[in-house]
Design a protein with these regions (language model features):
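Transmembrane helix-loop-helix hairpins at the membrane interface
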Residues: 1-115
Length: 115
């Protein structure tokens, strides 16, 4: 998740999808559409869960997570445009995943030092 997901996601979102959208829309509109798609796809991480009655949207965390993912996607898109390369976006995406994974790990780590 820290390395391979960012490679695939950046190739798809900032590479293929962004370019395809730019053939039809302005750069600004294309970037917004691509970032909104990124946010929507990532709702499954913290905004949507599978309950007994099917998929459920978590009313508190879903909007926060969606906005965070759209903002992070804008950072990745800016890095891609500024550098004219996917590598900085991939590196930033990998760093973001590492930090998020570390935060989740530390939050779930037992409070006591006994194992």
């Amino acid at each position: 998740a820290i390395l391979f997901s960012p490679i695939g996601e950046e190739i798809f979102f900032r590479g293929m999808l962004q370019r395809a959208l730019e053939e039809r829309f302005s750069v600004r509109t294309s970037t917004w559409l691509e970032c909104l798609a990124f946010g929507f796809v990532h709702l499954c991480h913290h905004g949507v869960v599978l309950g007994a009655s099917g998929l459920m949207l978590l009313p508190r965390s879903a909007p926060i997570w969606f906005v965070l993912m759209v903002l992070v996607a804008h950072l990745f898109a800016w890095l891609r445009k500024r550098s004219e390369s996917l590598y900085p976006a991939i590196a930033a995406h990998a760093a973001f995943n590492f930090v998020m994974g570390t935060c989740i790990f530390l939050a779930l780590w037992p409070a006591s030092s006994e194992l």
